[in-house]
Amino acid sequence: MKEPSIPDHLSPITHHGLAFAIWITGLPASGKSTIVSALKPQLEGLGLTVEVLESDEVRRVITPIPTYSEAERDLFYRALAFTGQKLVAHGVTVVFDATASRRLYRDFARSVIPRFIEIAVECPLTTCMERDRKGTYQKGRQGESLTVPGLQSPYEAPINPDLRIDTTTTPSGDAAREICDLVTAKFL
């Protein structure tokens, strides 16, 4: 799929004070949401107003009966990035808790949100499958879903993330502290 151009009204916004965006990406059940749960209060402890945009929650509004087609995913992640951009523009720090299986999705967000960091949550697929409480991988293995990242659909891991976190060795609280240290050094 060809990368779309950025409309003028989505050009990067530069008047946003201290706000920034963090995209936490990784395979389903890799530990993204667990890290985000530990991260949000730590960021708030730094005096930041924080909003988490969790993909499953937002998807229920944007695509209530998802097909996970390429076109639908592109629309969804562009809408998610747009929402994040608007929040950052109004001084709200945004944490994206979303697989965003293609680099293109995350790169689009980076292009419209200047103060942006990408966190790669790394975990072997077998461990993700063992941790999977939502049944995502089971549906994929049983043929009920044909677009599970890591199974039928590729997951494009970040090439140069701002931080890599191995959730098989790093507890969520430690991961959140590492992210806060990075944010403090980079933005605060």
Language-model features: where?
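Small-molecule kinase domains that catalyze NTP-dependent phosphoryl transfer to phosphate-bearing small molecules
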Residues: 122, 130-178, 187
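The conserved Walker
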Residues: 28
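C-terminal accessory "lid"/substrate-recognition subdomains
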Residues: 2-3, 45, 177-188
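Conserved substrate/cofactor phosphate-moiety recognition/catalytic segment
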Residues: 37-85, 89
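Glycine-rich phosphate-binding loop used to anchor ATP phosphates in small-molecule kinases
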Residues: 71-117, 121, 138-139
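Conserved lysine of the Walker
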Residues: 32
